[in-house]
């Protein structure tokens, strides 16, 4: 069984609320056939009554929730759990607006709507998928991407390399841009954790939104397609052996 030379896991990212800013982690525990703990656990509806009628249906398509490609005004907002995961904290550009119990979050949605009503079609609601995630696919996968891919995208588009555009869970050290796109079907080991690499992550217009200014003046998605002849950055992966991973852990690929 062939093995690649060992390289490192550079960063771990969790995005507690779909479409909002995330947080970096130093370590996390991963379970078999599960998303990264706390990732996309919550989602905020657009305020549509049609969506609110379907809230008991479980996983729902991203069009029902606020997202960067449709509501760039969400840039700068965070909704994060406290250390005990008993309360949620609403922040805007790092400043706390308010906090409320995780199981009674209506005041948080009222505050968000009051501060920025133009990004909603009505009063939003906070949805929660306990034990699951509001990822773009209903499959319980995580996402990972190579450092060289982020760097090369930045070079081609004249933008700083920034995972906030792509919202990947794991950034791994790579030498060649987009080499990970050829890893489908391979097994990755990070510490005691193993993952099966599944398929590329297709990108949408959300990557056009500047994560600092919320402006989307440049068609970065179009530049990506013209330069690379594809719009993929990152790979989906399925956890096959549980365990703990930490930044700077070394990883290996087997085939």
Please describe what each predicted stretch is:
Residues 1-255:
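Metal-cofactor-dependent catalytic cores
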